[in-house]
Amino acid sequence: MINSKLKNRNLNQVNVFNFSELFKLMKPRVMSLVIFTCAVGLLMAPSTVSTKDAMIAILLVSIGAGAAGALNMWYESDLDALMTRTCLRPIPMGKVNKNQALIFGTSLSFFSVIALDYFANTISAVLLLFTILFYVFVYTIWLKRKTPQNIVIGGAAGALPPVIGWTIATNSLSLEPITFFLIIFFWTPSHFWALSLYKSDDYKKAKIPMLPLTNGIESTKINILVYSLLMLPMVILPYAIDFVGLVFLVPALMLTLYYNILCFELYKFKINKFNPKKAKTIFGYSILYLFLIFVIFLIDKIL
């Protein structure tokens, strides 16, 4: 049970910047995924940049993503205090106040975009700015509390880091990096809806309109299965445009088919009921799945 004292903390009493807690606002685990996918996008590009410039640029992209995360926690601190999964975050715990989070997130946003324009190129900086603005204003402020399609549309922000990695190296956009975007974009719904199934009580407390609460369990299971099946054409697309070879296609299809099987097993459970263990398995596997897909991209290029 969430300690009711969390709701009554006077956050204005936090007057000193606690940098370890500010770092937590940046969602380090999300940042690590951003660093990885951005690096893959950069390494898959036909053009190259120096190792130093590449590392600086990727770091700046991760800082931009962290800034968006901090602004997300600033705006959603009221919801975070209500949910078991998020109640120990810095703002609900009273370790950082909302003004500090706002200043921190805004400052890092400006810094990361301006610095990326200087160290990389304008296209990459514009894409990073769009990512931050989309995540904060479209997903966090507009969609999150209004529609169960929040993560479908909002997933666009999380799908852009590998595209930015590509533009850092090439200073241009083409069809190839769009395949990275589509893979992450269509992966996102099944990943988060699996989480929302076994954490539905949390979302209910916070009155967040996730699909299990608005459309029911059965509809959620169907949507998870449908989006997992949509991953099949998404992993075939890079091969179809001659971006990758069979070294990518074969294992990517195998990983995706196993994902489909897991989602089908979740779907075929009793009507309007679900197996919590299976939902957790899908959520966990989806993270491993995305990581392996991007690893295979690199292996295909090396071989």
Curated annotation (Swiss-Prot):
Record's subcellular location: Cell inner membrane
Gene that specifies this protein: ctaB
Enzyme Commission code: 2.5.1.141
Highest taxon of the lineage: Bacteria
Main location: membrane
Name this polypeptide is given: Protoheme IX farnesyltransferase
Membrane-protein topology: Multi-pass membrane protein
Species for this entry: Pelagibacter ubique (strain HTCC1062)
Function: Converts heme B (protoheme IX) to heme O by substitution of the vinyl group on carbon 2 of heme B porphyrin ring with a hydroxyethyl farnesyl side group.
UniProt keyword terms in alphabetical order: Cell inner membrane, Cell membrane, Heme biosynthesis, Membrane, Transferase, Transmembrane, Transmembrane helix
